[in-house]
Amino acid sequence: MTESKSKEELAQARLDARAAKDFAKADQLRDEIAALGFEVIDIAGGFEFRAKERFPRYASTRDIKAIKVDGDIAITIIVDGFITDAIDAVRTIKANTKTPIIALVIGEPAELVDEIDLQFQIVAITENFGWGENTNALLKNLSTKYMLIMDPSTRFLGDAIAPVLTELDKGEFSAVGWRGGLVNTDDEWRSVDDKGAGEVDVLFGYFMAFNCADATNAGGFNNRAIYYRNADMEFSLRLRNVNGRLLQMDLPLEQGRHHGYYDTKEEFREVQSKKNYDRILERFRGKSAILSPRR
């Protein structure tokens, strides 16, 4: 679809495709019209349009229905305010890959709605149920083999999906990401050391892709994790606890201002981060057998 094509032009092309019995093309054109916010209705001698919701809206993550996505992998972003950053992130993705994108938006999507097309869709919820539960809702309702969760502050500088998909398809790693590290066992698991590309103990949610079946087998993300910080580490160790391996890669990405950290109230940030990390220490500290080889 090009920007110059109106819904009328697309609808006529759909009629022509149906007449030629090219039903796959007709379905694609129907979806393009839907992305513009309309349902096309066949009538005698032509067509008419009915306005439709451009995205679903739910009261709870438990109400979210299956998210239709083509392909083996989908990029997911949780958007809680800072819409301009989310728009920038979506545009850099579109400029570098055709991979489907789903934004789980808390509250009103505002101008982000203007980015909806065949590649990008929005799922909105009226209340924030926390990072862990929001991410699990995406994991549960996506039909893809792999899911990628990224922060709105992450920007694509090139195609970061192709190399990730190549590694995941090998089946050696349950998760692949951009930033991560090895748990520092010398300080009682209280820090993580970035050792660069290679096998790691934990990956961070700036950009992390994983096998959905492996993630589900590990128990997914912790619904008690209201805040993102350290929840990604907890998920990583859950994967390693069921023999999942994690790979950190050098990828064409950069990070802008991380609003989830810098623009969150300090007391909330520190309290929730500590709660997440305390769970890590309680469950995993001392279980060195689940860690990756030291390097």
Regions found by a protein language model. Give the residues of each.
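N-proximal low-complexity "stem/linker" segments adjacent to membrane-targeting elements
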Residues: 53-91
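Short, acidic, metal-binding catalytic loop of nucleotide-sugar glycosyltransferases
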Residues: 91-100
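Glycine-rich, basic loop-to-helix element that forms the pyrophosphate-binding segment
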Residues: 125-142
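Short aromatic/hydrophobic "clamp" motif used to bind/position activated sugar donors
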Residues: 147
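A recurrent flexible, glycine/aromatic-enriched loop bordering the glycosyltransferase active site
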Residues: 191-213
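Donor nucleotide-sugar recognition loop
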Residues: 216-240, 244-248, 252-254
